[in-house]
C-alpha cells in the first residue's frame, strides 16, 4: 500500500532533498511538500496523508506552539495521520525538550533530529 507523506519544512531546498531521499529509500510512497505552514492543514485535508512531517524552529511560523495547532487541525480531519516533528538538536536544547515531551505525552508519534542518518530518517517514517 502506498504511503502518503506531507512535508512541512522551512527550506524548499531541504524539503526537496528529503523528498528525493524518501522516494529512493522507501519502496512505495508519495511525497507532497506544503508550500506554507498556513496551508499544511488544508494540504492534509486534501491529500489525507499517512504521515505529516513538520520541522520545528524557535521562530514563527515554525514554532512548537504553531506546529501543535496544525497537528490539532490535521487530527480533526485525518485522525489516522501520524505526526512526526523534525528538530535541529544541535541549536536549541529547550525546543528539543519540548518535542521530546510531546512524544512522551502522546501528542506526536515520533520525532527526528537533524543529525540522524538518511537510513534512520526513512526507517522512522516508514515504521509509523
Where are these regions (language model features)?
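Conserved N-terminal glycine/acidic-rich loop preference
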Residues: 1-2, 10-19, 48-57, 94-108
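Nucleotide donor/acceptor-binding cores
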Residues: 2-4, 81
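Output/docking surface of receiver
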Residues: 9-10, 87-127
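Acidic, metal-coordinating helix/loop segments flanking the phosphotransfer/catalytic sites
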Residues: 35-51, 59-61
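Conserved phosphotransfer cores of two-component systems
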Residues: 45-47, 73-80
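Conserved phosphotransfer microenvironments
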Residues: 52-77, 87-98
Amino acid at each position: 500500500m502506498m504511503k502518503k507523506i506531507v512535508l512541512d519544512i522551512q527550506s524548499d531546498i531541504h524539503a526537496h532533498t528529503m523528498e528525493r531521499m524518501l522516494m529512493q529509500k522507501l519502496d512505495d510512497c508519495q511525497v507532497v511538500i506544503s508550500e506554507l505552514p498556513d496551508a499544511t492543514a488544508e494540504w492534509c485535508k486534501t491529500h489525507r496523508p499517512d504521515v505529516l512531517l513538520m520541522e520545528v524552529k524557535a521562530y514563527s511560523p515554525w514554532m512548537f506552539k504553531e506546529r501543535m495547532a496544525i497537528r490539532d487541525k490535521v487530527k480533526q480531519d485525518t485522525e489516522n495521520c501520524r505526526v512526526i516533528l523534525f528538530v535541529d538538536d544541535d541549536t536549541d536544547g529547550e525546543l528539543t525538550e519540548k518535542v521530546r515531551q510531546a512524544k512522551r505525552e502522546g501528542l506526536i508519534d515520533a520525532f527526528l533530529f537533524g543529525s540522524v542518518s538518511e537510513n534512520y530518517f526513512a526507517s522512522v517514517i516508514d515504521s509509523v
